[in-house]
Amino acid sequence: MSKVYDWFEERLEIQAIADDITSKYVPPHVNIFYCLGGITLTCFLVQVATGFAMTFYYRPTVTEAFSSVQYIMTEANFGWLIRSVHRWSASMMVLMMILHVFRVYLTGGFKKPRELTWVTGVVLAVLTASFGVTGYSLPWDQIGYWAVKIVTGVPDAIPVIGSPLVELLRGSASVGQSTLTRFYSLHTFVLPLLTAVFMLMHFLMIRKQGISGPL
């Protein structure tokens, strides 16, 4: 076993990587509130796992979406638990993200030289809100349908470009299959990919610059 480890160590310098991860200096003023960002990440990972599990049963069509969600909740093995955890962790992710933003702002974590870390965090906050908007519509029940209709209708108040924006969001002049398809694609592919990219940037900058000092 040691020979196998030595082989990998010679090529990848595993020990140096492990030392860098485990020996990072943690300032003495750090408390439990500095864990809010990590909790938000944990919620996101739970979202990915449970969301992926539901894609095996969910059908993104206006005629089958609601019935497929009912199937997940009533017939699929542990489907009710997986969807419930998905919903609870979604609410928890939003709450932890908001508290994390407040913590960073109140402790001055956005100041020089951490401006870019703050910017990526703001982008992540917008992406988190977008998850909520797109995911809310996927069951395609009365609440989801009218929520989509209202949200996608908001840009219509913008002069000149309002109507084209509404049609871009909906995929057509009215809410229908094109809208559900777009929201499903955003929720399951585009937003998770963007979130993963910006989270990686966020964490790399934190690793590089360290945790901000006390006020």
UniProtKB/Swiss-Prot annotation:
Gene3D superfamilies the UniProt entry points to: Cytochrome Bc1 Complex, Chain C
GO MF annotation, one: oxidoreductase activity
Keywords: Chloroplast, Electron transport, Heme, Iron, Membrane, Metal-binding, Photosynthesis, Plastid, Thylakoid, Transmembrane, Transmembrane helix, Transport
GO biological process, one term: photosynthesis
Main localization of the protein described in the UniProt heading: plastid
Highest rank taxon of the organism: Eukaryota
InterPro entries: Cyt_b/b6_N, Cyt_B6_PetB, Cytb/b6-like_sf, Cytochrome_b_N_euk/bac, Di-haem_cyt_TM
The family this protein is said to belong to: Belongs to the cytochrome b family. PetB subfamily.
Protein name: Cytochrome b6
Gene source species: Oryza sativa subsp. japonica (Rice)
